[in-house]
Structure formats: structure tokens, C-alpha cells
């Protein structure tokens, strides 16, 4: 599977019932969007394996899924906690100024004074805006280990260059 780049979009939870259904935890922005991205791959024993979605539905407020070949509780239990991934090629193209989180992780962050703030390790959703979690360089002049920088395009984030994996921000290095 070396030619494919897989992105995690969710995770299987515990079994539901005796007919092979599993709870599903979607990490897509809109919960049901996970079903728009097909085919799915499950990470089993460290390897991505294709899997076919047979059916899905809501049970109370939870999503539950039925996967092909998972016809009883025992076979479903083998898939519990498996990550769900999709090939990056199934994601739609974004407009200028919009980015997928996986594109931003690993980017070097520099401020307008050319100070290297560190590397984006993850993003957080706060409700009002996304936040870059930046691991500071080991010899940070301000003694920082981590910085939280709001991803406010044009206000704070001045430029994103995915070709060079750099994000330029208007942010004081002391914060």
C-alpha cells in the first residue's frame, strides 16, 4: 500500500448487538461526512486493509456500522478500536486559504521577525477557531516548550506555503 497515503478519519468502537455491528467515532467535521469518503481502510496489526461498508445507522445519538464479513459479535470484536482511514485522493480540493489539518501538521512556524517558533504537531478545535499546537525548538530563546497559536487567516496566519512546509504568523515569540 506504499502508493497510497492514508489519513485517519475515525475509529471503530465497541460491538453493538450480536449481528456484527460496531459503534463508530467519526473525526470528520460533519459526523456523517465519513460515509462520503470511500473506500475505507482499517488499521489491523499495523497494516492498512481495505474494508467494505455494508450499512450504517444511528442508534440513539451514536453511529453504528455494519462491515462486510462482520456477521457476528465475535468477528466484530476483532475490529474493535481499529482506526478507519481513507486515501487522501478522495478528499475534495479546497478553496484558497482553506487547508486540511494533515497538510499543516509538520509545518515550520515562523513569525514576522523571522523567529522560528517551532513545528505544528496537532490542531485543536475550540468552537470559535482552530488552534495550531506548535512544539517549540529545543533551544527556544523564550524557554517555551509549546505554543498555542490561533489559526485566524490574515489576522494571525499571514501565509501558508505547503511547498516549503512553512507557516508565517503575526505572533509574538514570547507568547
Swiss-Prot record:
Domain of life: Bacteria
Keywords from the UniProt entry: Chaperone, Cytoplasm, Ribosome biogenesis, rRNA processing
InterPro entries attached to this UniProt entry: PRC_barrel-like_sf (IPR011033), PRC_RimM (IPR056792), RimM (IPR011961), RimM_N (IPR002676), RimM_N_sf (IPR036976), Transl_B-barrel_sf (IPR009000)
Domain PRC barrel: 96-175
MF-aspect GO terms: ribosome binding
UniProt cross-references to SUPFAM superfamilies, sorted A to Z: PRC-barrel domain, Translation proteins
Cellular compartments annotated: Cytoplasm
Principal cellular location given in the protein's record: cytoplasm
Keyword Cytoplasm: yes
UniProt GO cellular component terms: cytoplasm; ribosome
Any GO BP annotation: ribosomal small subunit biogenesis
PANTHER family per the UniProt record, alphabetical: RIBOSOME MATURATION FACTOR RIMM
Summary of subunit composition and partner proteins: Binds ribosomal protein uS19.
Family: Belongs to the RimM family.
Biological role: An accessory protein needed during the final step in the assembly of 30S ribosomal subunit, possibly for assembly of the head region. Essential for efficient processing of 16S rRNA. May be needed both before and after RbfA during the maturation of 16S rRNA. It has affinity for free ribosomal 30S subunits but not for 70S ribosomes.
Domain notes: The PRC barrel domain binds ribosomal protein uS19.
Record-given protein name: Ribosome maturation factor RimM
Gene: rimM
Amino acid at each position: 500500500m506504499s502508493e497510497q497515503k492514508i489519513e485517519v478519519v475515525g475509529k471503530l468502537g465497541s460491538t453493538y448487538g450480536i449481528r456484527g455491528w460496531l459503534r463508530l467515532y467519526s473525526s470528520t467535521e460533519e459526523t456523517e461526512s465519513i460515509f462520503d469518503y470511500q473506500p475505507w481502510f482499517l488499521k489491523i496489526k499495523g497494516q492498512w486493509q481495505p474494508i467494505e461498508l455494508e450499512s450504517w445507522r444511528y442508534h440513539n445519538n451514536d453511529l453504528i456500522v455494519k462491515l462486510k464479513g462482520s456477521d457476528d459479535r465475535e468477528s466484530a470484536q476483532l475490529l474493535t478500536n481499529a482506526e478507519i482511514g481513507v486515501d487522501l485522493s478522495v478528499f475534495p480540493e479546497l478553496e484558497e486559504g482553506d487547508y486540511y489539518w494533515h497538510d499543516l501538521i509538520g509545518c515550520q512556524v515562523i513569525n514576522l521577525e523571522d523567529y522560528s517558533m517551532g513545528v505544528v504537531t496537532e490542531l485543536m478545535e475550540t468552537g470559535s477557531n482552530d488552534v495550531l499546537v506548535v512544539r517549540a525548538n529545543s533551544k527556544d530563546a523564550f524557554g517555551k516548550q509549546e505554543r498555542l497559536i490561533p489559526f485566524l487567516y490574515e489576522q494571525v496566519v499571514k501565509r501558508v506555503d505547503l511547498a516549503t512546509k512553512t507557516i508565517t504568523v503575526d505572533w509574538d515569540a514570547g507568547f
